[in-house]
Amino acid sequence: MSRSSDESGAATAELAMALPLLVAVTAGLVWLLAVGAAQVRVVDAARETARAAARGDGADEAVARGLQVAPEGSRVTVAVSGDRVRASAAGRVAGPGGLFDFLPAVTVHAEAVAALEAIPASGGPAGWPAGGP
């Protein structure tokens, strides 16, 4: 069985039409994976910051630990309220560009709360002023 002359090259033309679409979809999926990975990193940063502050590390040291884990350019904050420590981390993931240039950057955010493990005589975690930050 031989192909008729009007069907020759049809597979190549179909591939030429479909391949750019597959590349664009793949780029979009890779960007979604990057957003998911950044979300995991800010969750880890908030948790690490809260744990460090709850252990009694100073506020600056706790934030520094969180920044080590967080995506580059993220913001990490920590606050003491009563017998609890609340840490927050936020970062931005740039849009994928190219065909998806219309998509804005995505902000990922996470918070973590931990109970103070021990309260020193100063009234707060070590390195904190009495009464919290």
Residue ranges of predicted features:
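Alpha-helical assembly-interface signal, strongest on the long, hydrophobic N-terminal helix that forms
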Residues: 1-62
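Short, conserved structural patches
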Residues: 2, 55, 59-133
